[in-house]
Amino acid sequence: MPLEREVERENTALSAELDGGAFLESEVFSEERLPERQYCVFRAGRERFCFSVLEVEEVVDWPIVTRIPLTPAFLMGVFNLRGTIVPLIDIAFTEGRRPGLLPKHVVVALLKADAHREDMRLGIAADEVIGTFSATEEALLDQAPADVPHCRGMLRHDDRLALVVDLRRLVDVFPVPVI
């Protein structure tokens, strides 16, 4: 107990020195701040997409992809990620990406389990991984394009809009084989 009081007294003295002797209320407690989320932003085709960095497991250079016969056009195939077979989808396939044009990176996302599914790794083809940025939930624009059902809204990033991907909807819209 005495040690805690001593630390508290030192912190109070330091606070008094920093604010000129008057105690200022902490902005954290005096002002209602919305929590910020960090997003990973990437480009697929002509569009920018993003999702929470908590869902991103890693970003890898383009791997050796094994095509699977008789699969939908959005499923580019599967690849081996340190012994785990990961399905690879192209969310920009509707933009008419030329058949010979391969993306440069794969964003590996981890979709956490719910009551009906197990944890699932999913590779998403990306032409460019732009980076990360922070935004509040309030900054989310709810006007996602109607023809992009796997997005839950848009966020402004570098004077452009990035579609916010909802991984659960993505897996519902683009069902991938469970491997």
Report each predicted region and the residues it spans:
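An acidic, low-aromatic, low-complexity terminal/linker signal
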Residues: 1-179
